[in-house]
C-alpha cells in the first residue's frame, strides 16, 4: 500500500501532531512521515470536522501557499486536500501532483481543474455537498457508495480522465454527532466489502484510522488485510508494522 502521510495547515485539526504553522514545521513533519514509512504527503488547510472553523478559500490558500513548493522539493507526490476549486488550481500550479477532492468531485469546476492539470484524482464518497454537510447513509452503505461512484465516473469519462480516478469510500468523513459505536459498525461493513468497489477497475484509497483503541486497531488491520492501493495516514509506522506481521509486501 502506498501511504500519503498527513500534514495539516489548519489549526483546528483533531490530530494535533499533524498541525504545522510554518514551512519549516511542514518540512519537519513531512520528513518524519517519510522516515516512518510514508511514500507521499497529503496537505490540507481547511478542517473537515464540525469543530473546525470554515474559512474563506483565500485564507485556506494562504495557509498552504508557502508550503506546497517546499514539500514538492522532497521529490515525492504531494496531494492537495480541498473542496475548493480555487485552492486546488493554485496548489497544483505550485507543485502539488495529486488532487484529493474533498467535495467528492461534485463540482464541475473541480473536473475542469483536474483535466487542465492532468493529475490523479482521489474521489471520496460523500453523503453531502462537502464534508461539513454530511447526512446519514440510509440502507446498504456499499450500494450507496457504488451508486455515487457510477455518477462521478460518468462525469470523469466526459472530461476524459476516468482512468486517473482513485476511489475512496469516504470513511474518513462523518455526519456531526455520529455515535462512535454506529460509525465503527459502518466502517467495518464498508472495509469488509472493499472488493465490491473493484467493479470499476480503479485503485482504492482509504483514510486509515489513527486513534488508539481496540476498535480502531481492529479497523486498521482489517483495511491492511484488504490491500487497497493507497492509504491516507497519520502514523505510517503502524501500517508498516501490521504489513510486516501479516507478511504483506511494502510498496
Explain the meaning of each model-derived region.
Residues 28-44, 230:
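Catalytic domains of carbohydrate-active enzymes, especially glycoside hydrolases
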Residues 40, 98, 163-164, 230:
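Residues at the N-termini of beta-strands
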Amino acid at each position: 500500500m502506498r501511504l500519503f502521510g498527513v500534514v495539516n495547515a489548519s489549526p483546528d485539526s483533531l490530530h494535533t501532531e499533524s498541525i504545522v504553522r510554518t514551512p519549516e514545521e511542514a518540512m519537519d513533519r513531512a520528513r518524519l512521515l517519510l522516515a516512518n514509512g510514508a511514500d507521499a504527503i497529503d496537505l490540507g488547510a481547511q478542517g473537515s470536522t464540525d469543530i473546525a472553523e470554515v474559512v474563506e478559500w483565500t485564507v485556506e490558500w494562504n495557509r498552504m501557499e508557502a508550503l506546497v513548493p517546499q514539500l514538492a522539493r522532497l521529490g515525492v507526490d504531494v496531494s492537495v486536500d480541498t473542496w475548493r476549486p480555487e485552492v486546488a488550481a493554485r496548489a497544483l500550479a505550485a507543485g502539488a501532483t495529486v488532487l484529493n477532492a474533498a467535495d467528492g468531485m461534485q463540482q464541475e469546476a473541480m473536473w475542469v481543474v483536474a483535466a487542465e492539470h492532468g493529475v490523479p484524482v482521489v474521489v471520496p464518497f460523500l453523503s453531502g455537498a462537502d464534508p461539513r454537510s454530511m447526512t446519514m447513509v440510509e440502507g446498504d452503505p456499499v450500494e450507496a457508495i457504488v451508486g455515487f461512484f457510477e455518477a462521478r465516473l460518468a462525469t470523469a469519462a466526459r472530461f476524459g480522465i476516468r482512468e486517473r480516478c482513485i476511489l475512496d469510500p469516504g470513511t474518513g468523513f462523518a455526519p456531526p454527532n455520529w455515535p462512535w459505536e454506529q460509525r465503527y459498525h459502518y466502517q467495518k461493513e464498508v472495509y469488509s466489502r472493499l472488493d465490491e468497489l473493484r467493479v470499476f477497475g480503479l485503485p482504492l484509497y482509504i483514510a486509515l484510522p489513527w486513534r488508539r483503541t481496540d476498535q480502531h486497531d481492529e479497523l486498521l488491520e482489517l483495511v491492511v488485510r484488504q490491500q487497497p492501493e493507497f492509504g491516507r495516514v497519520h502514523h505510517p509506522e503502524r501500517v508498516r508494522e501490521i504489513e510486516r506481521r501479516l507478511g504483506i509486501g511494502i510498496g
